[in-house]
């Protein structure tokens, strides 16, 4: 398996499976080493304050079992930093290594997954994993295709956050739609910050959030699931990040976000709305702002990126999140060993929607991508000393 690393200078590598301990419990090793998720973060500068509590705060946002709308599966997602940080919680410049042990290694939930190992679960990666890895694929809890894999990303994203915080760059994500119930349009950064995590689904529109929550309760009773939309805003990103051809900033961010299993669509700024506008309406008008001493834009339909390069305005992204594929309603599928068409009812613990737990994963991946782009941009400018310095002020 390849493709477990993201980034060029600020590089994140993850490994581990959802329920690795289920295989290793009979080995003569301590229970703590049965299995878990690991994140290795390379390119972390020295001198950054980084505590396990700081990383844990991010992990707790996506941890299951916190509310009645979550899967009831209990995982502490407790993180341990085992390298790259000294006793004073200051980074050394060496790779930061983190492990999140699997608490749940043998229970009814895992046993049910084992009983389904021969069949393809609709909407999941079972069939494609069979085609690519055959009988050797980890088929308990979807292995590397499991949503639990994202816990390692969130841990790595917390490291990126610790660095970005020193630069005044903030990334915030929130739910704007659940199963067709939409929050108000154009939620501002200020509104999102003021109402951040004020309800179980992290929707800044507090009134619409009530409708969304009731819908999720109804869907959960049915044993079904629904999708939705998550929006991400990055504030404080300087102009100049990204490359103009194959490595456009929006391409890097799309790579980061579309690598999350449940994400099925993405748009920046006005996105598909540009198809309904004239050029005179679509264009963001630039002007010199004396108060800030730099060029600003009267609107932000571009979503903070022009020509593949950040323009200094808020970067705004929306992603489409598909329904949780594992549901309790009987579904038709295929037994890959007998090649029989069968019907299976997946009575395992699942979320009625992934949206309330995926937003911290979106935050993490955007932070990782932005910090990597920032490193590249700063390195490029450092060796381009013949560029007129006045442009740096704008």
Swiss-Prot record:
Keywords: Amino-acid biosynthesis, Aromatic amino acid biosynthesis, FAD, Flavoprotein, FMN, Lyase, NADP. It is an enzyme of class 4 (lyase). FMN binds at residues 144-146, 307, 322-326, 349. GO terms for molecular function: chorismate synthase activity; FMN binding. PROSITE patterns: CHORISMATE_SYNTHASE_2. It holds the Pfam family Chorismate_synt. Belongs to the chorismate synthase family. This is Chorismate synthase. The gene is aroC.
């Amino acid at each position: 398996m390849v493709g477990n690393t993201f980034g060029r200078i600020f590089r994140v590598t993850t490994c581990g499976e959802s329920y690795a301990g289920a295989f290793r419990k009979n080995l003569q090793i301590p229970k703590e080493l049965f299995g878990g998720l690991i994140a290795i973060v390379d390119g972390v500068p020295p001198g950054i304050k980084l505590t396990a509590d700081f990383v844990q705060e991010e992990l707790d946002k996506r941890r299951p079992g916190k509310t009645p709308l979550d899967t009831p599966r209990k995982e502490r997602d407790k993180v341990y930093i085992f390298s790259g940080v000294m006793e004073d919680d200051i980074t050394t410049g060496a790779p930061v290594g983190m492990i999140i042990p699997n608490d749940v290694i043998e229970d009814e939930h895992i046993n049910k997954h084992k009983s389904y190992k021969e069949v393809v679960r609709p909407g999941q990666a079972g069939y494609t994993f069979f085609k690519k890895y055959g009988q050797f694929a980890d088929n308990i809890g979807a292995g590397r295709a499991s949503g639990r894999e994202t816990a390692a990303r969130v841990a790595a994203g917390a490291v990126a956050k610790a660095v970005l915080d020193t630069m005044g760059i903030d990334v915030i994500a929130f739910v704007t739609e659940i199963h067709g119930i939409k929050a108000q349009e154009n939620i501002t950064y200020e509104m999102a910050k003021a109402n951040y995590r004020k309800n179980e689904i992290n929707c800044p529109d507090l009134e619409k959030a009530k409708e969304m929550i009731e819908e999720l309760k109804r869907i959960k009773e049915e044993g079904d699931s629904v999708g939705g939309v998550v929006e991400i805003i990055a504030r404080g990103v300087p102009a100049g990040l990204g490359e103009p051809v194959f490595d456009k900033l929006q391409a890097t961010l799309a790579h980061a976000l579309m690598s999350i299993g449940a994400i099925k669509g993405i748009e920046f700024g006005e996105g598909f709305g540009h198809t309904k506008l004239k050029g005179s309406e679509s264009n963001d008008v630039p002007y010199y702002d004396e108060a800030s001493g730099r060029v600003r834009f009267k609107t932000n339909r571009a979503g903070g990126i022009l020509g593949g390069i950040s323009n200094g305005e808020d970067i705004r992204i929306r992603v489409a999140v598909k329904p949780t594929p594992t549901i309790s309603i009987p579904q038709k599928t295929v037994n890959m060993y007998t090649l029989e068409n069968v019907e299976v009812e997946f009575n395992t613990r699942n979320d009625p929607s992934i949206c309330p737990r995926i937003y911290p994963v979106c935050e993490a991946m955007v932070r990782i991508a932005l910090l990597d782009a920032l490193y590249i941009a700063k390195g490029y400018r450092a060796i381009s000393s013949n560029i007129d310095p006045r442009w740096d002020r704008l």
